[in-house]
């Protein structure tokens, strides 16, 4: 099938390879996913090389040795660039992962490594919190990452049974966290897990009290915002003459005009845009609450420009897609920060202190609405806050408004 993609001796080796059918199936999958021909060609040549490596050692698939694969990749990537090394590792992974139909998993990031002894404990716990506490899938992944890290620490300390965990282990792990934010996050995760495990009779109910509870102050940091002129500059600097630019502009406009969270922009679907009624009707990822927004002309123009002349052809209903094969939605771990950072770089704000992700637009919009006199309830409705208490934090930035209601020193002295 791919004979004309090889030349000379390699063409004959490909035709006689015991893995030819495997290469044909996965190569066809890459064609269907619209990978660039040059990328497919690189993969095919690496698959042939790896196939020869297997034949020389009398190895068959899927029974391959992990150490052998690591040694092979170590030799292949020893004198190559970082980008070339990534391609080689991806080629081998795809070749090994593919099934009889040429389908393979697209790996995004490295999954957390859960120690063998802890896996049978973690699985029922995650099932419990997802079933009885309504834990979102993304939060469950964070729980997995944190608890697996704790289990790895325990294993390193020679502990592979829950009933051998001591308060000293908990405190040492907690204190090794890099800063206060991870500590608080790990602390709450561990306390919930310890309470559940104690209910199963696997450890003492007092262990959760060993997790430190540092004093926490609300509103310690001011929300980070841009000036309106800066917002306009960021949007105006996007090159909308390209499909990628039209996509990025639509993402930025949604964040700037509605203050939408990155997760809600990432998972916006075509079905949630009501063109006839001129509104966007979505369900928020973070809290599951519905949010209805008017489809502003500027937003409608940005979306239609992207959808009609920019979005890759796809049957997927998610609005925003990656513009490299396989042209799929962004991964759930992707908060679209690269789009915002590139936009800030174009106007010389790449090194600004503070936030540089899409949340910067969300905070800016909230503060601006407050400055023009919008009530907290109205702002909370626009931002999709479940409580105005969350919105209240933005009052600390609206200095002019606070100044108008400030009590003078003379009034205090009286």
Which residues does each predicted region cover?
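Conserved catalytic core of the tyrosine transesterase superfamily
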Residues: 1-414
